[in-house]
Each structure stands twice: as C-alpha cells, then as structure tokens.
Amino acid sequence: MLELNFSQTLGTHCLTLNETLPASGITAIFGVSGAGKTSLINAISGLTRPQKGRIALNGRVLHDAENGICLTPEKRRIGYVFQDARLFPHYKVRGNLRYGMAKSMTGQFDKLVSLLGIEALLDRLPGSLSGGEKQRVAIGRALLTAPELLLLDEPLASLDIPRKRELLPYLQRLAREINIPMLYVSHSLDEILHLADKVMVLEDGQVKAFGPLEEVWGSSVMHPWLPKEQQSSILKVSVLEHHPHYAMTALALGDQHLWVNKLNQPLQSTLRIRIQASDVSLVLQPPQQTSIRNVLRAKVANCYDDNGQVEVQLEIGGRTLWARISPWARDELNIKPGLWLYAQVKSVSITA
C-alpha cells in the first residue's frame, strides 16, 4: 500500500496528493504534459523532496517533511524505468540485468528473463537491440532489484507503433504474473485501456479523478479527453454461460447480460469489455423481433451536446454506459435525465 499525503511546488502550480494506492496491479497516472505525472513519481522515488507532507510504502516511511525523514532512492526499494532504457553500453544484457540484482532474486532470474522474452538477448550488447528490446531489459533490471514498487515513466513514449505493440503484451503478462504494484505514467489512452487496473487523472498538480479504470473512463472528468471516435464505456463483467448451439457467451452485467462471440473463458471469470458510444442506440420500449441480441434497461443520468451530436450518459446496475445520438433523436424521444429506456448494443469488444 502506498500512502501519499504531500504537497510540492511546481512552478506556478502545486502538486497536492492525499491518496492511498493499492498494493497490487497497475495504477495509471494520466494527464497532459505538465500535469505533474513525472513530478509525482520522482517524489515517490526520492529523486525530489516534497516541501510538506508524508509518503509511506507498506507502512515504511519514505518521506516525512515535518520529522526530517527522507530516505535516499537506493534505500526505498523502488524500481524505476525511464522513457529511455539507460542501459550500460559496455555491459551485455546479462551484465545489465545482474547489475544491482538482489541476492533474493537469484532464483528468479531465469523466470523473469522468460517472462520478458529476452533469453536470446542475454549475450548481446545494448547497441544491437531495438527500442522495445532495450525497454524489456530495463524493466527486467528494475525488477531484479526486488522492489516493493515499480515506477514506469512513459516507457513506450520513445518507441514507434510496431515497437509499442511488441512491448504491450509483455507488460500485460508481468501484471498478471508478478506480485509487485506498478505506477504507470502515460498520456496514451490506448496504453491505459490495455494495462491499467486503476487510473489517477492529474491536472495542474491536482487529482481530478482516481479509481478503477472502468469508473474513471466513464466519468465526466475523463469524457472530454476522449476523441469523438474513442467515446466509449469500459465495463467489468463476468462469464455467465456459454450457448451450446450458437457459439456465444453470456456476460453478466449486474442483473442483466450481454451476448458476445464465444470466449474460451471459464464460468465466473472476470474480464473487461469496451462498448463504443456510436454502437449504442436508444428506444423507449423493449423492441420486438430485432436482430440485435443485446438490449439493456437503463436510466438516463445526463445529456451533453457535443459538436452537433448528443452524448447520453446511462446508468446500468451502477455502471456507466455512453450512447451517441442526434439532437433530433433526443428531442423526438424527449430524452432527459431520469428517463428509463432501453439501450441496444450493436457491438462489444474485449479489452482484458
């Protein structure tokens, strides 16, 4: 568990935190350049010293301005992966990985190398590696120091799109198989969508939203960040049943369900789905004899005018579902907050 209760002056702004972050999974730190993302993880790592407040990791105080406590970075047991890999050019990959390796990690070396898919790179020098390969080695080196927390500062920012796609599956695998919490700094919506369990949105040094990905993604805070083509909802669901004849899987969403193409997932397993706002249409009465398999009862929470379209925020079993309709449809159906209606979902994609 990471306890953050501090403030630090950043030019004309002040980075202010009073949050407790989980001891597992990936927490994404999201915001535009200058929002305070890197300043936050620099304060956690010990590279900078907040003027006020306290930082504690798993009950161990890392920084306490009032009591004059400020552990040096090497005493914090925190791994840090930068935008650039910062490997030692004169050491082979094996030497880079073993540099600073904790004795307790000796027996984990082969497993971690396998998880990151870098077995074939061990006897090569960094200069011969691609950007994605260098970052995998940098992540491995950080993990072999046996950290209690791993900080990743936009590790994909300097990579081209093919290299980003190469590295994402390894990060997803690490998140599933190692029991080390990660803070992942990014301004990429795609990276956050595929990796994050929780999201913290920073703006001018202030926390605007913090919580599970599906809650923050569907919030009014996050909504303006999503380009029109990415306006969507993220929902956590569980596998309810598999249809024996039509090769479809039912996913439980509260006391309702959605049908998707058959998944090779056991019953009761959980996953996240994404529904584009443009794939949701609205009707006032349950449709009869429709080809659309997914029709959900929902309540209108809010409506927003957006460049000639209307974004409708719906509540379904305590979750948020967005729909995009025309002003004509809104006026003709008299759609307004508090109205109960039916959402027809035309397409569902699996994100994790």
Swiss-Prot record:
Binding site for ATP: G31, V32, S33, G34, A35, G36, K37, T38
Domain (ABC transporter): residue spans on this chain: 1-229
Bilayer topology annotation: Peripheral membrane protein
Family to which this protein belongs: Belongs to the ABC transporter superfamily. Molybdate importer (TC 3.A.1.8) family.
UniProt KW Signal keyword: no
EC numbers, comma separated: 7.3.2.5
Classification via InterPro entries: AAA+_ATPase (IPR003593), ABC_transporter-like_ATP-bd (IPR003439), ABC_transporter-like_CS (IPR017871), Mo/tungstate-bd_C_term_dom (IPR008995), ModC_ABC_ATP-bd (IPR011868), Molybdenum_import_ModC (IPR050334), Mop_domain (IPR004606), P-loop_NTPase (IPR027417)
Major location category of this protein: membrane
GO cellular component assignments: plasma membrane
Name the record gives this protein: Molybdenum import ATP-binding protein ModC
Catalyzed reactions: molybdate(out) + ATP + H2O = molybdate(in) + ADP + phosphate + H(+)
Organism for this UniProt entry: Salmonella typhimurium (strain LT2 / SGSC1412 / ATCC 700720)
One Gene Ontology term of the molecular function aspect: ABC-type molybdate transporter activity
Keywords of the record: ATP-binding, Cell inner membrane, Cell membrane, Membrane, Molybdenum, Nucleotide-binding, Translocase, Transport
